[in-house]
Amino acid sequence: MADRIELRGLTVHGRHGVYDHERVAGQRFVIDVTVWIDLAEAANSDDLADTYDYVRLASRAAEIVAGPPRKLIETVGAEIADHVMDDQRVHAVEVAVHKPQAPIPQTFDDVAVVIRRSRRGGRGWVVPAGGAV
């Protein structure tokens, strides 16, 4: 499946982390989501109902990030991915949760986890490099 919808750089304040100060003060998280879905019907019909609504995707992802604190960003990414996979039209999803202000003492640009889900292989199935599903 080559068709996909990409949401990049969704920035949301959340309270996720292992340390108490992360869960109290919170910090900025950046979310990237790629949804593999057949877009042929949407292209032919020109109807929002025939595609995956990226406005709703952004809204739900933001709700999850801003929601209850989690110790691990892996959990946050999995919640977003599982929500996307609730839509049976979706073939696969990849969610990257970036934590650019993570409490790492060394200088770094970013740290992220990437969660992938697919109908073909279920949880943890790896989408091949280049995104072909």
Swiss-Prot record:
One of its GO terms (cellular component) is encapsulin nanocompartment. Pathway: Cofactor biosynthesis; tetrahydrofolate biosynthesis; 2-amino-4-hydroxy-6-hydroxymethyl-7,8-dihydropteridine diphosphate from 7,8-dihydroneopterin triphosphate: step 3/4. Its main location: other. Keywords: Encapsulin nanocompartment, Folate biosynthesis, Isomerase, Lyase, Oxidoreductase. Possible cargo protein of a type 1 encapsulin nanocompartment involved in protection against oxidative stress. Catalyzes the conversion of 7,8-dihydroneopterin to 6-hydroxymethyl-7,8-dihydropterin, 7,8-dihydromonapterin and 7,8-dihydroxanthopterin, respectively, in equal quantities. After longer incubation times the only product is 6-hydroxymethyl-7,8-dihydropterin. Retains aldolase activity when encapsulated with a slight decrease in rate. It is not known if this protein is normally found in the encapsulin nanocompartment. The C-terminus (residues 119-133) targets the protein to the encapsulin nanocompartment. Homotetramer in the absence of substrate. Homooctamer in the presence of substrate. This is Dihydroneopterin aldolase. The lineage of its organism: Bacteria, Bacillati, Actinomycetota, Actinomycetes, Mycobacteriales. The gene is folB.
